[in-house]
From Swiss-Prot:
Residues 1-7, 761-782 are cytoplasmic. The lineage of its organism: Eukaryota, Amoebozoa, Evosea, Eumycetozoa, Dictyostelia. Heavily glycosylated. It comes from Dictyostelium discoideum. The chain crosses the membrane at residues 8-28, 740-760. It is a multi-pass membrane protein. InterPro entries: CD36_fam. One of its GO terms (molecular function) is scavenger receptor activity. Residues 29-739 are lumenal. GO terms for biological process: phagocytosis, engulfment. GO terms for cellular component: cytoplasmic vesicle membrane; lysosomal membrane; lysosome; phagocytic vesicle; phagolysosome; vesicle membrane. This is Lysosome membrane protein 2-C. Glycans are attached at residues 77, 105, 191, 219, 234, 243, 281, 368, 387, 401, 427, 432, 451, 465, 501, 536, 540, 595, 605, 613, 646, 692.
């Protein structure tokens, strides 16, 4: 019995040794197999190299729907605008946040290089998130400097120096283009045609009346004049006496069911040129009739004519309709077309503008017309004292045609026109003008409109409350939906809000990581560019796309920095590794954007530490991007003149938490600030002495770049959804399962052998020990 127990012990020990050896072997000899299995699982879960990839839908945009990608804003509110305009420092407060859910959609997708590259077009959209701590962007308003106006002056200053004027004075001059367009629109309107009819109609009526009177025979019980007045006012058919063709459009009741009922005495008063209320009186009567037509039956002029002429409202209206639509359309129009040498009445206004023929060589400003905005002559011959030698048709085709880029009714065309003078080329063949005519036009635009009458100055300054240097707008207008009235008036198609919604970009190409995991989700081309051409030197498009996916499987060789291509400022930015971190129970690595991410760099036009100069990207708008509250910017360009900034690292830091196995960014908070510049020489180069801004503070340091005013703070962050975190944990669990799967038979079998051997050994030992003790104990007792 003892021998059997010893055999059991020996066998158990042998089995346990074998089992332990197998278990150790399973862990020591198969790590390469495990890593391959794990890597393949991660690659399958991360790499998007075909439409069938596991994460294709997430990459295409579903990820932005399922997770909360938040873009949030704080607007800077200028609390003392009037003091600032009088030379005081600015006091700012931040208003917000205004939270938006940010989503993207990738479309027109194609793969190339055997799935190593993916080409796509991306669109982005932002939707305001009501609730949380978000303010309502549609009801909250703030006051600040207007980027549209600053951009306008900044752009104009490049040319105004050559012309020897300030940017604002050049603005007044160029505003002559839309001002002239406004003149011509009025002169080409039905209202002006009616004025021309009222002015010229009496002459041609008298001619027609004399012709007709000569054909009326004298076999009447009354005089031909009385007969004409009776027929003119009440005949509903062509009279039998007189030439029938000459009666055409000479009868106010013609074709009506019943006569007008106007008395003979009233008819005599209406058509008596000596009566100051007469339709044919060119001294006072013309003003009464024009104002009555323009201002309607309730106007004072209408009522005066009714009373003085002894007719009622219906009768007066009937006379007006006949005069404008009957007589003048037939007789006066043809004469005006002939005099102006034009084929269409639509060019009558241009004829008046360059010749003054339609109003008998008089300006429209000379007529006593209620609510007429032109108090001084606006026509070129009267304003300049000389006529142009070109015809009306030539002027319309070459100078005032809205459909051509060089039209003098646009600030672009007028700018080109003035440039010919500033460069002394005097080449105006583009407009088919002689030098004399060109000098007349330049004198008109440079001197007469801006400075003599103030038309263009007043027109520009009329927009200053809503479109000037400092304006008040809702948050929604500042961010997305700004309508700048001054830009619209000038015909400038330029966005005046800081952001764009539902934008569709040019195609981009990204590495999928199929051939090189380190390139996963890095740009090859950003919007068709592999090298950016907007900067002063070569800037290659490099870095990860801003959608949160970095290179996977970096846990064993953790990168000390991550380079992201920042789409808003068009340059690569590097974040440096800081420490370990954790997001919702998942181990991550924390990275930060360094403080000096925008150093002085001539390639990027950066002249001040902490400011990214984006003026060239935004059509001359002097935009400078910084960290929040201008953190890292020297005080002489920030807190020295700006009150309300919170320049602390904790406020401005930009963190990113990377899960290094999958390469997923589980948390980040990108924070940038938009600032606007007013240069130190703005008072001498930008602002006109005729304007409102010359008292604004300007640093006395001649080397200063001016003052930079904060506009808005932009933040973008993302928090993975609970579902995504749970899915990530499940993937880790699956990866762990994949990891042990190849050795499960060996390890489990080895473990069983180990356990069985230990059990057998223990049992054998126990039995041997029991028998030995039993034997010894018996001897003792005994």
């Amino acid at each position: 019995m003892v021998a059997n127990n010893k055999g059991l012990l020996i066998a158990g020990l042998l089995l346990s040794v074998i089992g332990a050896a197998l278990f150790v072997i399973s862990l020591a000899l198969l790590p390469s197999v495990l890593n391959v299995a794990t890597n393949n699982a991660i690659v399958d879960a991360v790499i998007v190299d075909s439409f069938k990839s596991q994460r294709y839908n997430d990459w295409a945009g579903q990820k932005s729907v399922d997770n909360y990608f938040k873009q949030y804003y704080y607007l800077w509110n200028l609390t003392n605008p009037n003091e600032v305009l009088n030379g005081k420092n600015c006091n700012f407060e931040k208003i917000g946040p205004f939270n938006y859910k940010y989503e993207w959609n990738n479309s027109k997708v194609s793969f190339s290089d055997d799935g190593n590259l993916i080409n796509y077009i991306q669109s982005k959209s932002y939707k305001w998130i009501e609730g949380e701590d978000s303010l309502n962007p549609f009801t909250v308003s703030t006051t600040n400097f207007n980027p549209a106006y600053l951009g306008l002056l900044s752009t104009l200053s490049k040319n105004s120096i050559t012309l020897g004027m300030t940017a604002e004075d050049l603005l007044y001059t160029l505003a002559s283009a839309p001002q002239t367009k406004q003149f011509l629109e009025y002169l080409s309107s039905d209202n002006f045609t009616m004025i021309a009819y009222f002015y010229n109609g009496p002459k041609y009526f008298n001619q027609q009346y004399q012709l007709l009177l000569s054909t009326i025979n004298n076999n009447l019980t009354t005089t031909p004049t009385i007969y004409f007045l009776e027929q003119w006012s009440n005949s509903t058919i062509i009279p039998t006496n007189g030439n029938s063709s000459l009666w055409d459009n000479m009868l106010i009741s013609y074709g009506l069911d019943s006569p007008s009922g106007i008395s003979l005495q009233s008819a005599l008063e209406i058509l008596n040129p000596m009566n100051q209320y007469s339709l044919l009186n060119s001294t006072n009567g013309i003003s009464y009739w024009i104002n009555a037509v323009f201002n309607g039956p309730n106007s004072n002029s209408y009522q005066i004519l009714e009373q003085e002429l002894g007719i009622n409202q219906a009768q007066l209206t009937l006379v007006m309709i006949w005069w404008l639509k009957g007589f003048n359309d037939q007789y006066t129009m043809s004469q005006l077309l002939k005099q102006c040498e034009i084929e269409s009445i639509e060019l009558l206004g241009v004829c008046q503008f360059i010749t003054t023929i339609p109003l008998g060589y008089k300006s429209i400003s000379q007529f006593n017309i209620t609510n007429l905005p032109w108090l001084e002559p606006i026509e070129i011959p009267i304003a300049m004292g000389t006529n142009l030698t070109i015809s009306t048709n030539e002027a319309q085709s070459n100078l005032f045609n809205d459909s051509i880029d060089d039209s003098l009714l646009t600030i672009h065309g007028l700018g080109l026109f003035l440039e010919q003078m500033s460069t002394n080329s005097n080449n105006f063949t583009k407009w088919n003008l002689t030098n004399n005519d060109a000098m007349t036009m330049i004198g008109y635009f440079l001197s007469y409109i801006p400075n003599t009458t103030g038309y263009s100055i007043k027109s520009v300054q009329s927009f200053y409350n809503t479109s000037g240097l400092i304006v008040t707008r809702t948050a929604n207008e500042w961010l997305w939906d700004c309508q700048d009235d001054l830009l619209d008036y000038l015909g400038i198609d330029q966005q005046c809000s800081f952001q764009q919604n539902n934008t569709i970009f040019k195609p981009s190409t990204v590495y999928t990581g199929k051939k090189d995991l380190s390139l996963t989700n890095q740009y090859q081309q950003f919007q068709e560019q592999s090298t950016l051409t907007i900067w002063n030197g070569t800037v290659n498009v490099t870095g990860f796309v801003e959608n949160g996916q970095m290179a996977p499987l970096v846990q064993d060789n953790l990168p000390q920095s991550l380079t992201i291509f920042e789409e808003n400022i068009l340059r690569p930015l590097s974040l440096v590794h800081s420490s370990s971190s954790s997001v919702m129970g998942v181990s991550t690595q924390r990275y930060y954007l360094p403080n000096q991410s925008f150093p002085i760099d001539p390639v990027f036009n950066n002249s001040i530490n902490g400011f990214a100069n984006l003026t060239g990207l935004f059509n001359g708008v002097p935009i400078y991007v910084s960290l929040w509250d201008m953190y890292g910017v020297p005080i002489e360009y920030s807190s020295l003149y700006i009150n309300g900034l919170n320049q602390t690292y904790e406020n401005a830091e930009i963190p990113l938490d990377l899960e290094p196995i999958t390469g997923n960014t589980l948390y980040y908070n990108l924070k940038l600030q938009i600032n606007l510049q007013i240069p130190s020489n703005a008072n001498s180069l930008w602002f006109s002495s005729l304007g409102n801004w010359t008292n604004i503070f300007s640093p006395t340091n001649s080397n200063s770049f001016g003052i930079f005013y904060p506009s808005l703070k932009i933040g973008q962050t993302a928090t993975a959804s609970t579902n995504d975190i749970n899915l990530l944990k499940q993937q880790f669990k699956q990866i762990q399962t994949v990891k042990i799967a190849p050795v499960v038979v060996v390890s489990i079998f080895g473990g069983i052998l180990l356990i069985a051997g230990l059990v057998m050994a223990i049992n054998g030992f126990r039995k041997t020990f029991y028998n030995n003790n039993q034997y010894n104990g018996y001897n003792i007792i005994n």
